[in-house]
């Protein structure tokens, strides 16, 4: 940790620094962020890109009185360090340590909890409205990236904020990944006068004077407005924001602290909503991240000198899915693939490379992705929509109304289902079985390993209705891949026979359950272990047989217990009047914390050792 950073405990300490020290602070922050991220993993490139921006914001604004809201939160590392969490930052993303995202219960400087994209402007507007209703005085600032602006929610909020004309500042962090940078001397000149506080006041005074000219005054003003608007449409990149009712300032250099301090100070003088457009470089200050900002967006542990990962990457469920889809689409031209701004994260990068004309990245627009897929399915295509479980929640209405109500053959590849690890509660995919299971016409499949994933994808592509196929983040199990095979819908698979009780489950934990059951054999306890494979429809014939045994039944899943797979088993037994004792194991009715996947699974009793102990305890009581 550098000597200047050592002197910084809270944002007020930043205001005491000289301009040269502010730039040195930026360098020290980058070094500290790189060091910690190399040891803990994290969202490195986004945070490196906003170091100077973060310093400028905390120099100008008076947090926590002033509210600074970071959209998504990938870029909030410097913010955390500068707001009293400097020493704790070494615990970033570790179990019991600092979250990788802003959290209200972690610090008063985290004005709003985030993790999902495009929410900051809505939250900021809500705070501004609350401020004004209560007669309070403080600034509200939303910091949103150009990528997050592809989300429809952001534009809904911009539209409403522009209409209400409340005092609000939106900082658009343009890291050159989506919005093209405006160029030209005249553009720079127009930007300079737009950031001058004299411009707004002087323009109004000039118009008032011209209007007083007899006969031609009002006409001159109208002509001037048309000419001005014509130039702005051609040359000013903020025209969209102006039309929505915002004052636009920029673009400015997001790595020039002095310039940003000046512009943020000016932004505070406006009575209505303001957009400040800053240009930053994702990964700034670390060669490997600058060269490959997408690859260093989210990283595991890596060597600082080379940028190479500490652990060699293992084959993941995502990779198996992506490559299998490429194989299966080879002779099926009707298969198309859709992602919501996550081509690499969902494994669809392989599909995009092989079939670019059949690949669609819609941006951060999950609702649009699902309904677009529905339209494609109406016209004979076979859309595969690959979205993380936690983000699929955003398109719930579209899944129901546009896909399942019409029984359209859309395949939902639900990635990152279950516990995801260090990204924590905003990213755990623990609700999808519950919110998808209630929807009529939808078939739900859950593979326990990568071979079953391939078979289920094959089955889904051949099914005539909508299918959700959920699988976890991280390394696959390591089983041998066998030929593709059509699975009969709603059939389970018995993995082990036993006489003392039945374990039935789905997904990753079933592998641990099988090992736990095998361990119990050494103690004379014999369990049947069943892979349900389908959460909807269930294998009702097999459940009837299980119920007739009058032995304890234990369900296992990596989903919240409420409304999940175990609940489906309970409902069927209740409907059929089967009095078998059932115990449901899964995620408790709470938001799991962040940490390694194994740590979180252990917390909820879903590891091999914990399941072994739990099975033994349950059987001793029932």
UniProtKB/Swiss-Prot annotation:
GO MF term list: 1-deoxy-D-xylulose-5-phosphate synthase activity; magnesium ion binding; thiamine pyrophosphate binding
Stated family: Belongs to the transketolase family. DXPS subfamily.
Catalytic activity: D-glyceraldehyde 3-phosphate + pyruvate + H(+) = 1-deoxy-D-xylulose 5-phosphate + CO2
Positions that bind thiamine diphosphate: 74, 115-117, 147-148, 175, 286, 366
UniProt cross-references to HAMAP family, sorted A to Z: DXP_synth
Annotated positions binding Mg(2+): 146, 175
InterPro entries per the UniProt record, alphabetical: Dxylulose-5-P_synthase (IPR005477), THDP-binding (IPR029061), Transketo_C/PFOR_II (IPR009014), Transketolase-like_Pyr-bd (IPR005475), Transketolase_BS (IPR020826), Transketolase_C (IPR033248), Transketolase_CS (IPR049557)
Pfam families (alphabetical): DXP_synthase_N (PF13292), Transket_pyr (PF02779), Transketolase_C (PF02780)
Pathway recorded for this protein: Metabolic intermediate biosynthesis; 1-deoxy-D-xylulose 5-phosphate biosynthesis; 1-deoxy-D-xylulose 5-phosphate from D-glyceraldehyde 3-phosphate and pyruvate: step 1/1
Gene transcribed to yield this protein: dxs
NCBIfam families: dxs, PRK05444.2-2
Cited CDD domains: TPP_DXS, TPP_PYR_DXS_TK_like
Cofactor descriptive note: Binds 1 Mg(2+) ion per subunit.
Necessary cofactors: Mg(2+); thiamine diphosphate
Protein name per UniProt: 1-deoxy-D-xylulose-5-phosphate synthase
Keyword entries, A-Z: Isoprene biosynthesis, Magnesium, Metal-binding, Thiamine biosynthesis, Thiamine pyrophosphate, Transferase
Top-level class of the enzyme under EC nomenclature: transferase
Protein purpose: Catalyzes the acyloin condensation reaction between C atoms 2 and 3 of pyruvate and glyceraldehyde 3-phosphate to yield 1-deoxy-D-xylulose-5-phosphate (DXP).
Annotated GO biological process: 1-deoxy-D-xylulose 5-phosphate biosynthetic process; isopentenyl diphosphate biosynthetic process, methylerythritol 4-phosphate pathway; terpenoid biosynthetic process; thiamine biosynthetic process
EC number(s) recorded for this UniProt protein: 2.2.1.7
Subunit details: Homodimer.
Taxonomic placement: Bacteria, Bacillati, Bacillota, Clostridia, Thermoanaerobacterales
Gene3D superfamilies assigned: 3.40.50.920, 3.40.50.970
One GO cellular component, as annotated: cytosol
């Amino acid at each position: 940790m550098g000597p200047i950073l050592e002197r910084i405990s809270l944002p007020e300490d930043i205001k005491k620094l000289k301009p040269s020290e502010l730039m040195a602070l930026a360098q020290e922050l980058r070094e500290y962020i790189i060091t910690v991220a190399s040891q803990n993993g994290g969202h490195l490139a986004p945070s490196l890109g906003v170091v100077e921006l973060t310093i400028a914001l905390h120099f100008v604004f008076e947090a926590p009185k002033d509210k600074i809201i970071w959209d998504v939160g990938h870029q909030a590392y410097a913010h955390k360090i500068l707001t009293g969490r400097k020493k704790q930052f070494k615990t970033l993303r570790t179990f019991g340590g600092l979250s990788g995202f802003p959290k209200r219960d972690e610090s008063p400087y985290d004005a709003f909890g985030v993790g999902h994209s495009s929410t900051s402007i809505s939250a900021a507007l809500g705070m501004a409205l609350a401020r004004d209703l209560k007669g309070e005085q403080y600034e509200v600032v939303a910091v949103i990236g150009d990528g997050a602006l592809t989300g429809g929610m952001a534009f809904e909020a911009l539209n409403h904020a522009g209409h209400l004309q409340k005092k609000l500042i939106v900082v658009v962090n343009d890291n050159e990944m989506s919005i093209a940078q405006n160029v030209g001397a005249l553009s720079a000149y127009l930007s300079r006068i737009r950031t001058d506080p004299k411009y707004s006041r002087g323009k109004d005074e000039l118009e008032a004077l011209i209007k007083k000219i007899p006969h031609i005054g009002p006409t001159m003003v109208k002509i001037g407005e048309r000419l001005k608007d014509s130039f702005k449409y051609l040359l000013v990149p903020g025209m969209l924001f102006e039309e929505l009712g915002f004052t636009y300032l920029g673009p400015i250099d997001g790595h020039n602290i002095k310039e940003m301090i000046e512009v943020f100070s000016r932004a505070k003088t406006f009575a209505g909503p303001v957009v400040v457009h800053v240009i930053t470089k994702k990964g700034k200050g670390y060669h490997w991240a600058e060269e490959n900002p997408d690859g260093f967006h989210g990283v595991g542990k890596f060597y600082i000198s080379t940028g190479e990962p500490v652990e060699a990457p293992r084959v993941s469920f995502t990779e198996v899915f992506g490559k299998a889809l490429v194989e299966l689409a080879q002779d099926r031209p009707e298969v198309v693939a859709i992602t919501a701004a996550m081509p690499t994260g969902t494994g669809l990068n392989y599909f995009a490379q092989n079939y670019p004309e059949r690949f669609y990245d819609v941006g951060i627009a999950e609702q649009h992705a699902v309904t677009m897929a529905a339209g494609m399915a109406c016209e004979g295509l076979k859309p595969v929509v690959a979205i993380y479980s936690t983000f699929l929640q955003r398109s719930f209405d579209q899944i129901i109304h546009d896909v399942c109500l019409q029984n359209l053959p859309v395949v939902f590849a639900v990635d990152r289902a279950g516990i995801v690890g260090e990204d924590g509660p905003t990213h755990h995919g623990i609700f999808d079985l519950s919110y998808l299971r209630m929807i009529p016409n939808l078939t739900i499949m859950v593979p326990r390993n990568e071979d079953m994933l391939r078979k289920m994808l094959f089955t889904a592509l051949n099914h005539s209705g909508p299918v959700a196929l959920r699988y976890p983040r991280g390394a696959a199990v390591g089983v041998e891949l066998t030929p593709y095979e059509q699975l009969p819908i709603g059939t389970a698979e018995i993995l082990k026979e036993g006489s003392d009780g039945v374990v039935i489950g789905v997904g990753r934990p079933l592998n641990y359950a099988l090992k736990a059951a095998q361990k119990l054999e050494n103690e004379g306890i014999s369990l049947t272990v069943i892979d349900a494979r389908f959460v909807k429809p269930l294998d009702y014939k097999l459940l009837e047989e299980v119920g007739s045994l009058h032995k304890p039944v234990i369900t296992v899943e990596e989903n919240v217990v409420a409304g999940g797979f175990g609940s489906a088993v309970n409902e069927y037994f209740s409907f059929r009047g089967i009095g078998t004792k059932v115990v449901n194991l899964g995620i408790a009715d709470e938001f799991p914390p962040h940490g390694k996947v194994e740590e979180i699974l252990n917390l909820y009793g879903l590891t091999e050792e914990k399941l072994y102990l739990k099975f033994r305890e349950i059987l001793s009581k029932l």
